[in-house]
C-alpha cells in the first residue's frame, strides 16, 4: 500500500510535546506546620538531633537551598586553599553562601526565625567533643558531615509526625520556598537569583504553581467561579 503513495502523509506531523510535570510544593500552611513541628520538638527535647533538624528544615525553607548545598556549608569560611569552604554562614549579615551547579557561588539571605534556630544549633554543636574535628555546620554525633540520606530520612519522619499527607523530601522545601516567595513578591528575577538558576526558564515553571494558587483562590472566593460547572 505504502509503495503507491507519492508522499508520506505524516511526514510533517509532529508528535505532541510531553507535558513537563510541575514541581511538588507544600502549601504555606503545610510548610509552616512542618517548620513549627521541628522547632517545637527542638524546644522540648533539646537534644542534638532535634535541634539540628529544626535548624536544617528552617534553613531549607528560609533560603531555598539544594540538599548538596546545605550539606556543604561550614560553620565559618575557610580561606585556606587546601581546604577552601564550599559554603559558609555569615552570622552577622544573616546570609549563607553556597556553591551551586556549575561551580557558581551565590549568597542568599536567611530569615530571622531560621537564624535563631541556627544559633541554637551552633550552641549545641559547639558542646560536642567531636565538633573540633569537622568544619561542617551540620554534623552527626561522631563529628562527621551529615549524609544526604540522613537528612532525607529525618525530614520524611518529621513530616509524618506533623501530619502532612504527602511524602516530603528536601527538594520539596526548595520548591515551596520558590513558590511562596513568588506568590508574595511576583519578582521572578529575584527568585531566579536566590535559587541559583542559570536560565530564567528554569524559574518560570514556578509561575505555573503560582497560577494554580490563584486559580484555587478564585474558585474559593468568586461567587460565580463555579457557575456552569
Regions found by a protein language model. Give the residues of each.
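Conserved catalytic core of the tyrosine transesterase superfamily
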Residues: 1-229
Amino acid at each position: 500500500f505504502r509503495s503507491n503513495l507519492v508522499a508520506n502523509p505524516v511526514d510533517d506531523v509532529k508528535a505532541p510535546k510531553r507535558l513537563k510535570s510541575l514541581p511538588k510544593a507544600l502549601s504555606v500552611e503545610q510548610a509552616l506546620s512542618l517548620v513549627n513541628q521541628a522547632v517545637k520538638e527542638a524546644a522540648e527535647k533539646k537534644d542534638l538531633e532535634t535541634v539540628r533538624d529544626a535548624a536544617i528544615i528552617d534553613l531549607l525553607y528560609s533560603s531555598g537551598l539544594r540538599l548538596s548545598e546545605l550539606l556543604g556549608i561550614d560553620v565559618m569560611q575557610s580561606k585556606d586553599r587546601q581546604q577552601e569552604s564550599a559554603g559558609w554562614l555569615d552570622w552577622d549579615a544573616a546570609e549563607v553562601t553556597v556553591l551551586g551547579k556549575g561551580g557558581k557561588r551565590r549568597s542568599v539571605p536567611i530569615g530571622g526565625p531560621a537564624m535563631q534556630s541556627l544559633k541554637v544549633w551552633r550552641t549545641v554543636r559547639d558542646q560536642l567533643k567531636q565538633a573540633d574535628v569537622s568544619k561542617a555546620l551540620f554534623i552527626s554525633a561522631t563529628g562527621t558531615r551529615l549524609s544526604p540520606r540522613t537528612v532525607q530520612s529525618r525530614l520524611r519522619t518529621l513530616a509524618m509526625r506533623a501530619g502532612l499527607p504527602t511524602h516530603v523530601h528536601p527538594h520539596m522545601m526548595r520548591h515551596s520556598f520558590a513558590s511562596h516567595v513568588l506568590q508574595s513578591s511576583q519578582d521572578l528575577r529575584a527568585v531566579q537569583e536566590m535559587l541559583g538558576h542559570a536560565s530564567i526558564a528554569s524559574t518560570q515553571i514556578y509561575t505555573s504553581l503560582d497560577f494554580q494558587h490563584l486559580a484555587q483562590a478564585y474558585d474559593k472566593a468568586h461567587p460565580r467561579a463555579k457557575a456552569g460547572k
